[in-house]
Amino acid sequence: MQEAYIVAYGRSAAAKAKQGALFHERPDDVAAKVLQGVLKRIDGKFNKNMIEDVIVGTAFPEGLQGQNIARTIALRTGLSDTVPGQTVNRYCSSGLQTIAIAANQIMAGQGDILVAGGVELMSAVPMGGNEPTNNPTLQYDDIGASYPMGLTAENIASHFDVSREDQDAYAVRSHQRAYDAQRDGRFKDEIIPIQVNSVEYTNAGPKVHTNIFDQDEFIRPDTTMEALAKLRTVFKADGTVTAGTSAPLSDGAGFVVLMSGDKVKELGVTPIARFVGYKAVGVDPKIMGIGPAYAIPEVLSLSNLSVEDIDLIELNEAFASQTIASIKEVGLDISRTNVNGGAIALGHPLGATGAMLTARLLNEMGRRPDSRYGMVTMCIGVGMGAAAIFEYVR
């Protein structure tokens, strides 16, 4: 069986939905710019038209993210029209699912060079899509399939005894870690700077300005327990979850390029990390945020590893309550988890998150010569969880 290696990675910076740097951009254009930057990072005798497929995840593949956006991205990237594209949707793990699909295809001998990643501009397609169509039977049966994500976060807080103070403290730490990382330039090598447009509205009419976007927009180093304590709960009158302990609506994109071991040798390309394993699981939709606590043991078992073997973990912070509960349930080491902050401070562009977290993980592993295994994991809407393991090549 072939091994699948990541040979390049990169992400956009994360932007505020509806008001940030990507508000005036198209999702396919943003993704194409990021992918172009990632492809430039591959050494050896690689040629972009050697790519055999472009697999792109998005949580809401409709409107500006519809029409098989993966194929559009491939063409906008400047790839040959012989390079196909497929769009994948597993909600919040879509960008990680594409990496698993590409890796498994390589391991099965069905390809040698594939692109995987994700894009989500929540500025372009709103949360829930343009026309939410929840199944009425599931809604009436009250199994949680139609619950707002914030309500499931409240359920997690109650079920796993996560206090308001615990959530606020976690959010403060996420912002502080992200601020420290940004200040120290730790995100620089994982972010692909892209050219974007901004619009200034004047009495003479709108003026378009061109800017370079390369800084995550959500980090607030001035976040304090006192400030968070003043926020009202959002999803339940007597609840504990606030906007300050939830991931903000975000825009972003991320990609990796995977290559078979044989092709790595043939082209003289430098491998970065080996794909070890991936697992997606289902959980009670009413407590969907606990998904990582079920996916992590499954992927560890599949990979013949223990939690102690994992040197770094990127656990998507959809909400502080579910992140804290998942960490406690699995027994993760907080000193190894989200070391540069997480989604509360860095955003969660849904279908792009898996690929963006993979870029963040590999970038940090590259800075730590003693790290070997890394993990990306997240909860998924409507009651699921996913986790993937990578081995850094030294």
Residue ranges, per PLM feature:
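N-terminal extracellular/periplasmic Venus flytrap/periplasmic-binding protein-like
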Residues: 11-13, 24-33, 169-266, 329, ...
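Conserved catalytic cysteine-centered active-site region
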Residues: 25, 58-111, 132, 143-151, ...
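Conserved beta-ketoacyl condensing-enzyme motif
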Residues: 22-113, 119-135, 191-213, 286-287, ...
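Condensing-enzyme catalytic core mediating Claisen C-C bond formation in acyl metabolism
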Residues: 1-27, 224-290, 294, 301, ...
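Active-site-proximal alpha-helical scaffold in enzymes
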Residues: 89-119, 157-187, 255-262, 327, ...
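Glycine-rich loop/linker segments at domain edges
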Residues: 12-18, 104-160, 221, 365
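Short, well-ordered amphipathic alpha-helical segments that serve as non-catalytic structural scaffolds
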Residues: 27-43, 69-70, 98, 149-156, ...
